[in-house]
């Protein structure tokens, strides 16, 4: 599913994550270049708990802060996932470093 550059904010990402919970065949989710902040990114990342076929998740070029990156990695560390590709490249995060 390609949702790149649709100006989706965190609230929209949360609704999307809730809507996709039953879509267990989802393999690719591209949400690059939206306006998603940490809370929305965490909701999307938690899809990995129920989507064992998700292979690629792109959350790059959003507004995910340092805590969000740590949270995403924590979810990945605690789930039994098959994710092969994760993009969390973030210009906001780069300015913090």
Go through each PLM region and give its residues.
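Leucine-rich tandem repeat or coiled-coil scaffolds
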Residues: 1-97
């Amino acid at each position: 599913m390609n949702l790149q550059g649709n100006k989706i904010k965190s609230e929209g990402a949360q609704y999307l994550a809730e809507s996709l919970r039953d879509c267990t065949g989802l393999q690719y989710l591209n949400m690059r270049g939206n306006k998603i902040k940490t809370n929305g990114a965490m909701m999307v990342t938690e899809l990995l708990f129920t989507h064992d076929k998700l292979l690629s998740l792109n959350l790059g070029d959003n507004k995910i802060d340092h805590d969000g990156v740590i949270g995403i990695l924590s979810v990945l560390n605690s789930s039994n996932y098959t994710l092969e590709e994760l993009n969390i490249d973030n210009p906001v995060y780069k300015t913090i470093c």
